[in-house]
Structure formats: structure tokens, C-alpha cells
């Protein structure tokens, strides 16, 4: 149990924090070095199944990486090609906020993983992600849905993998009456790298249990 808690802590720690490096070395956790938005980072390699391991990309706590990724994401699409930014909670929240700040956007939208008391008449769709067990739902308040109706929406995610979360966000935008103007991500993982309907900053492979790249 202690070992499990420590491993979760490693993922949350900033990649280059001295304590994070110490814990990864002490607990023999494999990492994958990457250049992301011009910054060098090491992603902890985490188990999904016995045959599938992924590199954990976490912006939480890494202000430098968040600012750099937001800057580069904004370069992927023309500013006049969309009206609003849209993402789902939770890992992409720092990114979308920083993108809005840098671009001067006054409003952006976040799909929530549960209905909130402040949401009037929320709409929802189902979502299944590689990093989340089971099927979950994404919710959007009717007030936000009304603002989205008829508008061009740029969907952003931190990592696109199986595409389940991305599809759920597309469905939620469509249910609100919005128009998907583009789909962008920091990283495209595994087979998602071959998609021609997304733009991303860097490819991310998937891994074997020994930390080697899965072919």
C-alpha cells in the first residue's frame, strides 16, 4: 500500500523535482525523456494493463511547462478560426486557462465529470478514457450550452490516446449546438499519432513493462 501511494506521488510531482528524481530511482520506476514545447521532461511510465504501459504527462504543479505548452498550442490553429476553447476536466484545466490568458479570451468551457448544483438543466454524454476505469459522463450546464450554440469550438486535450474522451467532447459540443472547428492536444499517444483530424505538439509512444517502446 505504501509503495502504491509513493508511486502516485511520483506522478504528481514535477518531473524535475529532486525528490521526484530520488523516488523514481529508489523505486525503480522507468521514465521516458521528452522535449515538450521546448522543455526537457521525463515522463513516469505507468501500468494500464499487464501488456500496456503509458507515459504520464502531468502539467499540475509545473507552471513553466503549462505556459510553454499553451503558447505552442495556440500556434497550431489560426486565432480567427474558432470562437471558444473547450476541454474536459481535470488535467487540461491549467492548460486551457493559460491558453485563454495568453490569447486574451474572456470565456472558455470545461466539461465536468459530474453534475454540479450551479448547473441549470445540464446536458451530458458518456466518456471512456484509457486512464479512467469504467464509463464516466461529461456534463455541461445549459447556460454554457446556450453560449456554445452556433459557435465554432476548438477542442483541446492534454493527451489524445484512444480518442474516447475526444469523441465525448465532440458529442457534447454537438449536443449543445456548437460546431467543432478543430481538435488539438499536447501529445498524441500510440495510434493517435496517425490521425489526420487532430493537431498536436509531439508524439508519445506506449511502452512495455520494462520501459522499452512498444512496437
Predicted regions and their residues:
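Short Gly/Thr/Asp-enriched flexible loops that form oxyanion-binding sites at enzyme active sites
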Residues: 95-103
Amino acid at each position: 500500500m505504501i509503495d502504491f501511494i509513493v508511486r502516485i506521488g511520483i506522478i504528481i510531482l514535477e518531473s524535475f523535482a529532486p525528490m521526484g528524481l530520488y523516488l523514481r530511482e529508489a523505486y525503480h520506476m522507468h521514465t521516458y525523456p521528452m522535449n515538450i514545447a521546448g522543455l526537457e521532461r521525463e515522463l513516469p511510465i505507468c501500468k494500464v494493463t499487464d501488456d500496456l504501459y503509458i507515459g504520464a504527462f502531468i502539467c499540475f504543479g509545473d507552471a513553466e511547462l503549462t505556459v510553454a505548452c499553451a503558447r505552442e498550442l495556440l500556434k497550431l490553429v489560426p486565432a480567427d478560426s474558432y470562437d471558444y476553447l473547450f476541454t474536459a476536466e481535470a488535467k487540461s484545466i491549467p492548460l486551457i486557462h493559460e491558453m485563454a490568458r495568453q490569447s486574451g479570451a474572456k470565456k472558455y468551457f470545461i466539461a465536468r465529470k459530474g453534475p454540479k448544483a450551479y448547473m441549470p438543466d445540464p446536458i451530458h454524454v458518456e466518456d471512456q478514457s484509457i486512464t479512467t476505469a469504467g464509463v464516466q459522463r461529461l456534463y455541461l450546464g445549459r447556460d454554457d450550452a446556450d453560449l456554445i450554440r452556433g459557435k465554432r469550438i476548438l477542442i483541446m486535450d492534454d493527451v489524445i490516446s484512444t480518442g474516447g474522451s475526444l469523441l465525448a467532447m465532440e458529442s457534447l459540443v454537438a449536443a449543445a449546438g456548437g460546431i467543432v472547428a478543430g481538435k488539438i492536444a499536447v501529445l498524441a499517444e500510440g495510434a493517435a499519432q496517425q490521425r489526420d483530424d487532430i493537431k498536436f505538439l509531439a508524439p508519445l509512444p506506449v511502452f512495455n513493462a520494462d520501459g522499452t517502446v512498444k512496437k
